[in-house]
């Protein structure tokens, strides 16, 4: 079992952070940054209790899970796997969500193939899942 742990002091806010992983699981916790770009080829990507204003995340084969993340702009992509977001009020975002093969569940409502919402708040989420589901809960 190989593990790499990078610790950033609590009072530090990063300008940007980028991490790429070919195979394995990436866990990002308690990060504060203006922008973040995370990519996993095969494995899971979990981001929790973080504030990343402009977040880009991509997973080729595996899940992306965001929990209690404060972001103004999210660009998320999953080729084969699911996208799960909890602790986010989707009604405050202009949203463009799409799945090719799977469902989209926003709070208690289920949509097939696409979901759009224009909140006019300046916050946005763009998410595309090729094969899998998108689930967003408050």
Q: Residue locations for each model-derived region?
A:
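Short, surface-exposed interaction patches in beta-rich subdomains
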Residues: 47-50, 54-138
């Amino acid at each position: 079992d190989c593990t790499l742990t990078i610790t950033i002091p609590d009072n530090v806010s990063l300008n940007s952070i980028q991490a790429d992983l070919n195979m394995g699981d990436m866990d990002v916790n308690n990060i504060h940054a203006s922008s973040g770009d995370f990519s996993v080829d095969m494995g899971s990507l979990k981001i929790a209790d973080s504030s990343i204003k402009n977040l880009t995340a991509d997973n080729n084969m595996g899940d992306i899970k965001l929990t209690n993340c404060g972001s103004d702009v999210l660009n998320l992509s999953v080729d084969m796997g699911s996208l799960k977001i909890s602790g986010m009020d989707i009604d405050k975002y202009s949203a463009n969500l799409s799945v090719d093969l799977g469902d989209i569940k926003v709070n208690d409502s289920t949509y097939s193939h696409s979901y759009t919402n224009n909140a006019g708040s300046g916050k946005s989420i763009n998410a595309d899942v090729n094969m899998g589901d998108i689930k967003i809960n408050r």
